[in-house]
Amino acid sequence: VQWTAEEKQLITGLWGKVNVADCGAEALARLLIVYPWTQRFFASFGNLSSPTAILGNPMVRAHGKKVLTSFGDAVKNLDNIKNTFAQLSELHCDKLHVDPENFRLLGDILIIVLAAHFAKDFTPECQAAWQKLVRVVAHALARKYH
């Protein structure tokens, strides 16, 4: 995938403002609340019985931070995302058997979280760059499935 200088700037500029722990926790919690069937991959996380339980679950918070920290690797390696996520793709495909559609859903939720947190900075141009990024990351994570 090719990135313009403007796209790179919009992505890295916004990423520098992101609180990975807070935005990661919110994104994963929203995924589990909005798309409850995704909860089956997190059975070991304990109580996911309600939005309040999910939002207060420390394991959801910790894994959300881990997910978004990993997403930061994509931001740092925009020109090599496929290889950056090769091992994670293998893990999610071969060991965890995660439906690759869930990567797209999480990407869409991340867009919503970023827009909510950075409304002033999240211009249509910024959104377009981030939509492209989450699409590329989702594709890289789903690569092992193809």
From Swiss-Prot:
Heme b binds at residues 63, 92. Keywords: Heme, Iron, Metal-binding, Oxygen transport, Transport. Pfam families: Globin. Red blood cells. One of its GO terms (biological process) is hydrogen peroxide catabolic process. GO terms for molecular function: haptoglobin binding; heme binding; metal ion binding; organic acid binding; oxygen binding; oxygen carrier activity; peroxidase activity. GO terms for cellular component: blood microparticle; haptoglobin-hemoglobin complex; hemoglobin complex. Residues 2-146 form the Globin domain. CDD domains: Hb-beta-like. InterPro entries: Globin, Globin-like_sf, Globin/Proto, Hemoglobin_b, Hemoglobin_oxygen_transport. Heterotetramer of two alpha chains and two beta chains. Belongs to the globin family. Involved in oxygen transport from the lung to the various peripheral tissues. This is Hemoglobin subunit beta. The gene is HBB.
